[in-house]
Structure formats: C-alpha cells, structure tokens
Amino acid sequence: MKLTATLQVVVALLICMYNLPECVSQSNDSPPSTNDWMRTLDKSGCKPRDTVVYLGEEYPESTNLQYNPRCVTVKRCSGCCNGDGQICTAVETRNTTVTVSVTGVSSSSGTNSGVSTNLQRISVTEHTKCDCIGRTTTTPTTTREPRR
C-alpha cells in the first residue's frame, strides 16, 4: 500500500515539474502582486482582438451568394471598460481584403439560369484602434470598398 501511495506522489511531482509554470501560477501561497494585476488588466482591456465574423452578416444584401469559408478572422474591438457607462468601440478602422470562394445563383426572368463559383477578394472592416467611450457617443463609420 505504501508503494502505491509513493508512486502516486512521484507521478504527481513529475507532472508538476513537467508543467512547472502552471503549477507555480496556481499556487495561492504568494500574495498577489501589482504585476499580476497589470497582466490581468492588459488581457481584459479594450483593444483589437482576433474575432470571427460571418461574411453573410458583413454583406447582408448579398442573399443570393454563399461564401466559403463562411467566416473569417479579423481584428475587432473587444474588452472591458472601467466605467459602466462606457463601451469598447473602434475609433480607427481600415478595410482589409480576404480571398474567398463565392457561389452565386443567377436568375433571368425569375427562373434559375445557373450557378457559378469563383474566387474573389472581398473587403472586410478591421478595427485598428479602440477606446472606451460613452454609450451615447456615435461610432465612426467606414465606407466599404466595392466588391471586385
């Protein structure tokens, strides 16, 4: 019985040594530090982050088109603001292009005349700078480049 308990302790120590950063960070023996707080604040703050956006929502007027992939990853503002009356909002944006496969159904006089699929570059808005602003403040608008 002692051998089994000893082996369990040894295995636990080996696992902990292999994952040393996780074992140390989960320890509550040391008091919280300003550096810990700053890391937490930085991780949760208002800033551009990788965000998955659905192309159908980016181009709602294109109901006869299907995109593949259906979604892409771009930077969008997200995070926590200190005040309850504030929201993390884009203050600078830019258009970026992504290449997708677009399938469209063309119709003539109400009848389906064909399905076509081709690769296209389309424009998606990406946030480059974020700020916490009052909820009543208007957000900047970005003009969308025409699709090619």
Curated annotation (Swiss-Prot):
PROSITE patterns: PDGF_1, PDGF_2. Glycans are attached at N95. It comes from the Viruses. Keywords: Disulfide bond, Glycoprotein, Growth factor, Mitogen, Secreted, Signal. One of its GO terms (cellular component) is membrane. InterPro entries: Cystine-knot_cytokine (IPR029034), PD_growth_factor_CS (IPR023581), PDGF/VEGF_dom (IPR000072), PDGF/VEGF_growth_factor (IPR050507). Disulfide bonds join C46-C88, C77-C130, C81-C132. GO terms for molecular function: chemoattractant activity; growth factor activity; vascular endothelial growth factor receptor binding. SMART domains: PDGF (SM00141). The keyword Signal applies. One of its GO terms (biological process) is response to hypoxia. Residues 1-25 form the signal peptide. It is found in: Secreted. Induces endothelial proliferation. Belongs to the PDGF/VEGF growth factor family. This is Vascular endothelial growth factor homolog.
